[in-house]
Every structure is written in C-alpha cells, then in structure tokens.
Amino acid sequence: MALRRKFTFELPEDSYWNESDSNSSGLFDDLQSKQLQARAAVDNLFGGDETPKPYVRPQNPTPTPTNVPLQIDGRAAAVSDKANIRITDTSPRASGKIVDDFLNMKFAENVNVAPVIQTAPSVVSEASASSLPSEAQRLDLDYNRLRQEHRKLKDQHEVLRHERFQPLTIEASIKRMLQGHTVTLDYYRSLRDKTQLLKQAVATYDNNTIFKIVIFLERTLKENIFCKIMDGQKSACRVYTRHLQITGEWDKMNKFLRSIGQYQHASVIEFEATRKYKRNPDKRVPLLRTMLHGSFSIPEMKFEARQMEALMRNYEIQLQMEKMDAGDKGEHFRKFPKTSSLIGLPALSSLYYSAMYHYDDSPTSAASLPSVQTLIRFNDRLATQTIVSALTRLSRWPDIDKLLQPKTITMTFSAAKSVFKGKKSTSKWGVSINNHNLLTIVKRSHPSPPTDFIYRILKGESDAQERLRLALLFDVPEMVIECLTQKGDRLSLASYAKSLKTNSVESFKAVAALNNPSIKWK
C-alpha cells in the first residue's frame, strides 16, 4: 500500500486530498460517473433473469455448527476467486476498486451469478454493493469539505510565504540585529540598500553589528566597490582591519589599507608581516630592502626608513659576529658561555655582545665596540648603561671608570647643556646618566661589587642629601658616616653606629667621629 505523505506548507500539492495525488481513490476522479456505474451494477446484480431460486431442503440434513462458516455455491465461489473480490473488506478506499473489477468481469465474460442462499443471508458491509450510493454521498461530502479546507490552507500558505520572503526595512533589520535575532541580509541587493545598511550599522556604534554588515558587503560586492563604500567609514575600517589582524591576513589588510589611502598604515602592516622571518635574516633582509625602496620611500615614512636601515645594519653585524664566534674558543666564552644565538635580537643586544666578548678587539674589526657604535646610532645614555652592565659582569672596574669619565670638552659641554635645559644632573660623569641607575646596574650585574668602587661613584654625587640617600640604599657605611658627619647630625650618627657590626672597621670609624671634638654638631 502506498504511504500517505504528510501535508506541509512548503509543498501543498502533495497533500492526500489533491485531485492529482496518486494515493487518492478512484471515486474522486469522477464522482458522478462512479455513482452511475454503482447504480448500474446494483441493477445488474438484482435484476433480469438472475432471480433467486427457491430453496430445496437437503435429504440428509445435518446440523450446522455455529462455529462452521456457511457453505456457498461452487459457481459463486469460482466467481469470487476469479474476481479476487473480498466481500468482508470494509475499507472505504477499496470500494471503487471492487466496483471496477466487478464491472470489468461482468462485461468481459458472461458469468452466471450464483443464487443467494435463503438460509444464510450475507452480512451487508460498508463496501458491499448495497451500500455504494450512501457511501458515495458521504465521500462526496467529505471531499467537498477537504477541498474547502485545502483552499483555505493554501491561501494562508500564500500569505505566510509572502510575509516570509518580504524583506524588512533597513531600520528594522538593524534593530533585530542589535537584539540578537537572525536577519537575512541577502534580500538587500541594490548598492543603495547596502550603503544604507553600513551607515545605519555605523550609527549604532556596535562593533558586532558593524562587523556582520562589513562581512556581508565584502561577500556580495566587488573589491573596488567594497573599498569605495568603506572609504570614509572609520569605525567600519577599524573593525575590518582588526578582524584581518586577528585572522593573520596581512596581505589582504595591506591591500585594503592602500585602497582607502592609508599608505603609512599599510607600510607598517607590510613590515609586521616580515616578523615571521625574524630568525631568518637571509629571507627578511631582502624583503626589508625592497620595502625600503618601495613603501618606505615616501616623505611621511622618513623616520621609519631610518629605523629600517638600522635594523638591516644590525642584521649584518649579527651575521658577522656569529661567523667570527662560530668556534667559541675565547677566554670569555669559556667563562661566560653563550646560551642562545644572536640572530634576531635587538640592537642593544648586539652592543652588549660586542662589549662582553669583543671589547679588546681592534677598532677596525667588524665586531669591535667602536665599529658597532658607528654602524648603529645609539642613545648615549642607553649605550653607556649597556656597556657598563657588560663590563660589570666581567669585573672590569677600571674600564668602567674610564668609560664614565668625560673624554673631550665637547662631552663636558653637552653635560652642562642638559643642565641649562632643566634636566637634573648631579653626577660628575661626562654622559647624562643618573647615579641611582648606575648603582642599580652595578648591583644587578655583579653579586658583590667592591665597596671602594661604589664609594667612588657616590663621591661623584654633588648633592649631599642624594648622596646620603644612595649610601643608605646601597649599604655603603663609610659614605653614610661621612655624610652624617658633614651634616653635624650626632643623634643620627649615634643611632646608625648601633646598627653596625661590633668591632668592625665601620663601627670604629663611627665611634671616632662621635668622639672627635673638632666636629661641630647640631
């Protein structure tokens, strides 16, 4: 039996009450003609020469059990078997087939219908011939009701489909997106609607809504039209570039920024894309050289171009140092072995490496300290702090003193010039370095620096109050005693003397200062 398909709004033609449906009964094709055929079949069944014969009682009657089925004439059984008519079938859908089969058999062959046995009348079922007129009327009524229901549902389906595929207004769509509902944007096909969508989204200041509209425009518009619409919408451009940055699409971001006129940002993005070759200078240096003569050649990128040149020179110095120190056979390498490669590290790391392992090299050597300082322009303060840190680790205290002393009159004038500019500089060094920072670097780079070296650094501090503070901070008892004696603060000196170790040199100096009658105490 064919399965009955479920009615759906999307495909109402497949409903079981449709006239063209394969599952519909034969009675629904032409109900009036079927009724006429049914009446004719009834007349043929009970009319003409086929009248029932009188009943003849058998000679040897035998009681018929109630549970034994009634016996029918052989001719009637043959006709029933030949026509495959199941009289007890009560299905309304099978009634049409019964009548059709019976009529075909009736007109095809001249079959004599067996007389009806009077003693055992048959039970009239819903699908029997006598019930066909009333059954047809009932089916006709049901069919008309189903047609009316089908027409009503079809009209409702058309209304729902019209409302479903009718696009909302742009304001309503943006409002639904802000509320978190699903909105179909494919209905907005014109360029005007898409432009209005972007403007309305930007006006909401909601990044999620702006991002959805931008992705929709990118998917449905050509690249030049998309960039033209995005130009002028800073919020949308910022959201889109952030998305490209997260996904790592640097080439696409570079192309987009150039299309909207942001050449400086595009150059920076192009430079950021080369960071993946940070440890591979053979690939990064050619790219940097191409960018230097390309996107970084505009006047607005002059400062960035100088930084790129310094980066390329740093790579060259690092490659030369790595080539020279391939064996690591020097004394410093045995005492302080290398822990990692120098390639890809900042320029200050190259300077520290040169001061650490090549401080005594000839100035003409590519890895020497003067050569590195010549190729890469460092800030004086940063360069001095870096070199002092390397020399402190090597415990080269005389070299540090020599480095900190002013070498020329020009350096002395430069230090004095910083004072006139309002910069506080109380140290005696020729470079603009703070004594506090200098002592911090020394303490950090060496576990136990000599006390006399720290004392010499503090001696160069011109401010007495700052000198006392640094002496207490870095624990230089000799300088603390000297400062308190100069101030004439007897109570502070007596309190500090109690904190010193008994019978130590510093303790004897503090007691001697307290017992000195020539000192004027406050």
From Swiss-Prot:
The keyword Transcription regulation applies. One of its GO terms (cellular component) is cytoplasm. It is found in: Cytoplasm; Cytoplasmic vesicle; Early endosome; Recycling endosome. GO terms for biological process: intracellular protein transport; oogenesis; spermatid development; vacuolar protein processing; vacuolar transport. Coiled coil: none annotated. Keywords: Cytoplasm, Cytoplasmic vesicle, Differentiation, Endosome, Protein transport, Spermatogenesis, Transcription, Transcription regulation, Transport. Signal peptide: none annotated. Residues 47-68 are annotated as: Disordered. InterPro entries: Spe-39. The keyword ATP-binding does not apply. Expressed in spermatocytes and spermatids (at protein level). Disruption phenotype: Mutants produce spermatocytes that complete meiosis but do not usually form functional. Show defective vesicular biogenesis during spermatogenesis with morphogenesis failure of the specialized Golgi-derived fibrous body-membranous organelle (FB-MO) complexes. Show disrupted processing of endocytosed proteins in oocytes and coelomocytes. Proposed to be involved in endosomal maturation implicating in part vps-33.2. May play a role in epithelial polarization through stabilization of apical membrane protein content. May play a role in transcriptional regulation. Plays a role in lysosomal trafficking, probably via association with the core HOPS complex in a discrete population of endosomes. Essential for vesicular trafficking during spermatogenesis; required during spermiogenesis or sperm activation for the morphogenesis of specialized Golgi-derived fibrous body-membranous organelle (FB-MO) complexes. Interacts with vps-33.1 and vps-33.2. Associates with the homotypic fusion and vacuole protein sorting (HOPS) complex, impaired by vps-33.2. Belongs to the SPE39 family. This is Spermatogenesis-defective protein 39. It comes from Caenorhabditis elegans. The lineage of its organism: Eukaryota, Metazoa, Ecdysozoa, Nematoda, Chromadorea. The gene is spe-39.
